[in-house]
Amino acid sequence: MARQTDVRPIVRLRSTAGTGYTYVTRKNRRNDPDRLVLRKYDPIARRHVEFREAR
């Protein structure tokens, strides 16, 4: 069972293009205490957009 205080929790990255496409990744809470923002490819929008951490 995963603990709530896990150092590397699984986070869901949701597209800011409004397509509803998501990536699932893990992040290190010690290095990235804020919400994660990555620029990745959205296949529905067919371009690179910002993906923000959704909670």
From Swiss-Prot:
The entry's keywords: Ribonucleoprotein, Ribosomal protein
Gene Ontology BP terms: translation
UniProt-listed SUPFAM superfamilies: Zn-binding ribosomal proteins
TM regions (residue ranges): none
Origin superkingdom: Bacteria
GO cellular component: cytosolic large ribosomal subunit
Keyword Ribonucleoprotein carried by entry: yes
An MF annotation (GO) of this entry: structural constituent of ribosome
Similarity annotation: Belongs to the bacterial ribosomal protein bL33 family.
Protein's name according to its UniProt entry: Large ribosomal subunit protein bL33A
Species for this entry: Salinispora arenicola (strain CNS-205)
Lineage, highest ranks first: Bacteria, Bacillati, Actinomycetota, Actinomycetes, Micromonosporales
Underlying gene: rpmG1
